[in-house]
Amino acid sequence: MPEYNAPLRDMRFLLNDVFDAPALWQRLPRLAERIDADTADAILEEAAKVTGGLLAPLNRSGDEEGAQWQDGAVRTPAGFREAYATYAEGGWVGLTGNPAHGGMGMPKMLAVQFEEMMYAANASFSLYSTLSAGACLALDAHGSEELKNRYLPNMYAGTWAGSMCLTEPHAGTDLGIIRTKAEPQADGSYRISGTKIFITGGEQDLTENIIHLVLAKLPDAPAGSRGISLFLVPKFLVGDDGALGARNAVHCGSIEHKMGIKASATCVMNFDGASGWLVGEVNKGLAAMFTMMNYERLSIGIQGIGCAEMSYQSAVAYARERLQSRAPTGPVARDKAADPIIVHPDVRRMLLTMKALTEGGRAFSTYVGQQLDLAKYAEDQEERSQAEALVALLTPVAKAFFTDTGLESCVLGQQVFGGHGYIREWGQEQLVRDVRIAQIYEGTNDIQALDLMGRKVVANGGLFLSIFSREVRAFAAGANAELAEFVTPLLTALDLLDNLTQGIVARAGNDPREIGAASVEYLHLFGYTAYAYLWARMAAAALRQREADPAFHDGKLATARFYFARILPRVHSLAAAVEAGSESLYGLEAEQF
């Protein structure tokens, strides 16, 4: 298995040169007191050491051994417990957590880059941590002060973990039909009864306690999603003094045997009258849980970027060393029997596609992180509201597009290796297996597309999109002549997106099938256009800073040109599919399939 080296140079370029994050942090008072350029750089350096030195060496062995279940207990692979203890001691679980309860309060722009390192180094290990961080976010946003004081400090410290319990055997996307029940008790608690499946980290041996956030319905709850409440259910009950007490009536019935992320325990959880406490308001549980789900959706999107980065690093190293045939223009390595395969056109196409998509995704994730920071910390209400709209618009795109292109990149990386890419020892086949799930969990990518098209575009008449479009057009208007080669095709793609949006909004009023028919291609078209915007911004920064590091910045410009020449044109075929409408999708009766 190849080594992982965090792309710190590229991450610094984004934070400092493209987005000028230090200047943003200094104008947001609550961040200014915690973070500056030097602190951010030190955190990234330490994160690179932790992920490359501690987590990456456990990736292959963790996949080989997998999580093991016996008599209700789960054992993580060898080395995971020790690594998690070191990881937790470093405060990484609470990186963006509320300082009032022991979190570090760092900006999301920094956290998304750390999460990418995590997923690149060891996707299975990362899931135990990111689920805990998401549970903390939901509890901090919606829990009572008593619950926050009792649980958050240990969760931020990594002593206790968190899980998200939504799915049931009969209820996946449609959570309105869940059957898990919550019966009120005289002491203010609830008895939780039901079975949840596909629960990441529902049971493990890494932490002293596991805090489950569980969706359930009260006996008199309204039907459907309007009757869902959210409950906190600890594995071990916690006393008023914070000490662990008796085991709660929640147990792991089994774990799933999966295609990938084998070191991550995916659990069947049985709640047999377990004690739980209400989080937020009665019958408002789905809204509260979406705080965690939206965090997880961005995080899982970043899994796609991380796996793609690891695949790219491995493929580049292999392509430089593997000797096969001669370059089309004649021998390059004259002292060898053949040239390295990196000289061949299609190998270069694959590597450049991986590089352009992965670096574009890294820029997009950092941009979403910036909007999350503005939504949380900006002093001006209008600025916060605009950032919130962009976060709502971009989150489904990030989750689906990062993971779709992440799988594409990992398959390309495997292809660069040829037959060796299909062999376990080289690591590429594990990356393909591990990244595949990212298109499925935390809301399948087609559900993300429906969310984007239905709720985030059509429902508000394209208002959220207009905010994004205005920002892109303002950037283009301020660009100098050197950027024309990037700005011109960017505006062409944006015009296409804007015009298609208007057409879909108009057609959806007459035929509700239009939303579903257009949604996946529309999301991809949006993704490629957003990447074009970010590649244009990276090109602008590279031109400004070129003299400081010509090799790096010239590489950025060359990759940007490849993106605009060879990848962005995909928007035209996607637009044709969107314009085709829903008719061809309904040409067959169900019996004809």
Q: How would you label these PLM feature ranges?
A:
Residues 32-34, 64-76, 288-299, 313-354, ...:
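Glycine-rich cofactor-pocket loops
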Residues 133-135, 144-147, 444, 452-496:
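A structural-propensity feature for long, helix-poor, extended segments
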Residues 80, 131-132, 143-185, 369-388, ...:
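Internal maturation/activation junctions in enzymes
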Residues 1-126, 150, 373, 583-593:
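Amphipathic, small/basic residue-rich leader segments at the start of a protein or domain
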Residues 101, 459, 475-593:
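C-terminal amphipathic alpha-helical interaction region
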Residues 198-200, 237-253, 258, 265-296, ...:
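A glycine-rich, basic-preceded beta-loop-alpha segment at the flavin cofactor/substrate interface
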Residues 189, 193-247:
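A short core secondary-structure module
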Residues 2-5, 19, 91, 184, ...:
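Alpha-helix capping/hinge segments and adjacent helical runs
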